[in-house]
Curated annotation (Swiss-Prot):
Keywords: Calcium, Cytoplasmic vesicle, Disulfide bond, Glycoprotein, Hydrolase, Lipid metabolism, Metal-binding, Secreted, Signal, Zymogen
Protein name as catalogued: Acyloxyacyl hydrolase
Residues holding Ca(2+) 2: D185, D187, D204, N206, D209, V212
Organism from which the protein derives: Oryctolagus cuniculus (Rabbit)
Encoding gene, per UniProt annotation: AOAH
Positions of the catalytic residues: S262
GO cellular component, one term: cytoplasmic vesicle
Residues that bind Ca(2+) 1: D183, D185, D187, Y189, D204, D207
Spans annotated as Lipopolysaccharide binding: 172-176
Annotated CDD domains: acyloxyacyl_hydrolase_like
Signal peptide residues on this chain, from the entry's feature table: 1-25
Propeptide part(s) removed at maturation, as residue ranges: 26-34
Region described as Important for enzyme activity, localization to cytoplasmic vesicles, and protein stability: spans on this chain: 37-69
Length: 575
């Protein structure tokens, strides 16, 4: 759930420190988590992929490295840089593979992974038959004088190597040029998809005018311009009445806003990036988008997704349902989620929420921090680092007060319970990870222990072989959910109604099983932790059904003019 996962994806692909230019500082995770631990994970993943590509295509390691480079997209000179890396470092990697060592040994030999004094040895694959020390000594001897060692030992970054300085310069420039010049934070709505653009909140329809944005009440019934970007504007020539007045007045338009974590933002590492049997140039086409979206896919999320899902599931996001119910709601969505977010830092998220109490339509706000209050990067005593019910109570009340001063009257806030993470271990521990499917050698138990050992596990409490720890984590999550339920039952606010909904995972599993699915198919394959796209859409379906049944006012009325809006304005300018 933490942002350094991005480092894991970008840096190993090139083994370059690109992350410093693409990531933004956030998270309040303990400072003990070091980015080189992610480099170790990244190295093991990439080396495994190279090894398996050679195996599947019955090719040399050299050919397999070049094959991987050929699959990478051209953006940011990724492909060129990859070939460069093969040219410089390939010979050493080949020499190591010749000695029949696994990815753990390769990465420890090249010092992308380091066993620190007094710390356990972290490995993904089973340990070699000969002793670890002996194997490593032997491997180290092979690459003693190699350029890659000069790099990893210098700690100064690969760009400090004279023969790579030029290409580094080129990559940095390419990244800089791919980022919109406009400061994406100062103006919250954007005409760009990524970097917190319209994948995250409704697309702006006039980038040069700050009084124009999705979710506002129409200015002068939008007779002359589309001030709220819902695609409805102008005057009906037949009777001189503005369309926005004719079709939307009294229709109770409203937006949807999610205050969430990586699950709400739909964190997802495509399994295609690691599955060699299917790997092709198509596998990495989405890499630049993914990286500039913090490895999140809000455009496909259960709450604010607006693109068609690639999964065969027919369920729609909450946003698309609200839009279908009342087409005046077009583009009124905000996914204010962040990897690593929890009740502890939700207040800073609210600062980036855009809602003007006087000018805008009411909103449905969903607070869904489903894990990070009990998940944290600390291996030593994870329980003491969890949010207590008292702390959660204080954090959430502060957040609600802040919301009360932001939201237009008539809004609704739904507090969502915490996840039931014990499901992860129960469902996955004996299954093979995508990386282990070819040779049946990496299970989720091994992945969890590898990540936990390196202190980069997104949730050591639940992603653990320790049954007692998993139970304690679940117990605390339940106490926190109960606290949220109590707050919703006892507190009143002037500008919104407050509700609580359980994270009813069992119901989602049952629904999925009725559709012929298996429980493990609801979890992200690569990280073995997050709910995947199917799960998120099933959750959205469940939430919608429950709200419609219990509190129908939250969703607003069905707009009888929907067919006319479609007739006059088509897809209303799309998303
Ligand atoms: Ca409009």
């Amino acid at each position: 759930m933490k942002s350094p996962w991005r480092i894991l994806v970008v840096s190993p692909l090139l083994l370059l420190p690109l992350h410093s230019s693409t990531s933004r500082a956030h998270d309040n995770q303990p400072g003990t988590i070091r980015s080189d631990h992610y480099t170790c994970v990244g190295c093991v993943l990439v080396v495994s992929v190279i090894e398996q590509l050679a195996q599947v295509h019955n090719s040399t390691v050299q050919a397999s490295m070049e094959r991987l480079c050929s699959y990478l997209p051209e953006e940011w000179v990724l492909k060129t840089a990859c070939y460069m890396m093969v040219h410089v470092f390939g010979a050493d990697i080949i020499k190591l593979f010749d000695k029949d060592v696994n990815a753990d040994v390769v990465c420890h030999t090249l010092e992308f992974c380091k066993q620190e004094p007094g710390q356990p040895l972290c490995h993904l694959y089973p340990l070699p038959k000969e002793s670890w020390k002996f194997t490593l000594e032997k491997a180290r001897h092979i690459v003693k004088q190699s350029p890659i060692m000069k790099y990893t030992r210098s700690g100064a970054g690969i760009c400090s190597l004279p023969f790579l300085a030029k290409i580094c310069q080129k990559i940095k420039l390419a990244i800089k040029n791919s980022v919109p010049i406009k400061d994406v934070d100062s103006d919250k709505y954007s005409i760009f998809p990524t970097l917190r653009g319209y994948h995250w909140r409704g697309r702006d329809c006039n980038d040069s005018d700050k009084t124009v944005y999705p979710g506002r009440r129409p200015d002068n019934w939008d007779a002359h311009r589309d001030s709220n970007c819902n695609g409805i504007w102008g005057v009906d020539p037949k009777d001189g009445i503005p369309y926005e007045k004719k079709f939307c007045e009294g229709s109770q338009p409203r937006g949807i806003i999610l205050l969430g974590d990586s699950a709400g933002a739909h964190f997802h590492i495509p399994p295609e990036w690691l599955t060699v049997s299917q790997m092709s140039v198509n596998s990495f086409l989405n890499l630049p988008t993914a990286v500039t979206n913090e490895l999140d896919w809000p455009q496909l999320s259960g709450t604010t997704g607006f693109l068609d899902s690639a999964s065969k599931i027919k369920e729609n996001s909450i946003y698309l349902r609200l839009r279908k119910r009342n087409r005046c709601n077009h583009r009124d969505y905000q996914n204010i989620s962040k990897n690593g977010a929890s009740s502890r830092n939700v207040k800073s998220l609210i600062e980036s929420l855009s809602r003007n109490q006087l000018l805008d339509h009411p909103a449905i706000v969903i607070y869904a921090m489903i894990g990070n209050d009990v998940c944290n990067g600390r291996k030593t005593d994870p329980v003491s680092a969890m949010t207590t019910p008292e702390q959660l109570y204080a954090n959430v009340l502060k957040m609600l007060e802040a919301l009360n001063s932001h939201l237009p009257t008539g809004s609704h806030v739904i507090l969502y319970g915490l996840a039931h993470g014990a499901f992860l271990w129960d469902t996955l521990h004996s299954r093979y990870h995508p990386l282990g499917q070819l040779n049946k050698d990496v299970t989720y138990t091994q992945l969890y222990s590898f990540l936990g050992c390196l202190q980069v596990s997104p949730c050591p409490g639940w992603m653990s072989a320790n049954e007692t720890l998993r139970a304690l984590t679940s117990e605390r999550a339940q106490q926190l959910s109960e606290t949220l339920r109590k707050i919703a039952a006892s507190k009143k606010f002037t500008n919104f109604n407050l509700f609580y909904l359980d994270f009813a995972f069992q119901e989602v599993v049952e629904e999925w099983q009725k559709m012929g699915g298996q429980p493990w198919e609801l979890i992200e394959a690569v990280d073995g932790f997050h709910p995947n796209e199917v799960a998120l859409l099933l959750f959205a379906d469940q939430l919608w059904e429950k709200v419609q049944r219990q509190w129908p006012d939250v969703l607003g009325k069905e707009n009888p003019f929907n067919p006319q809006i479609e007739e006059v304005f088509g897809d209303q300018g799309g998303h």
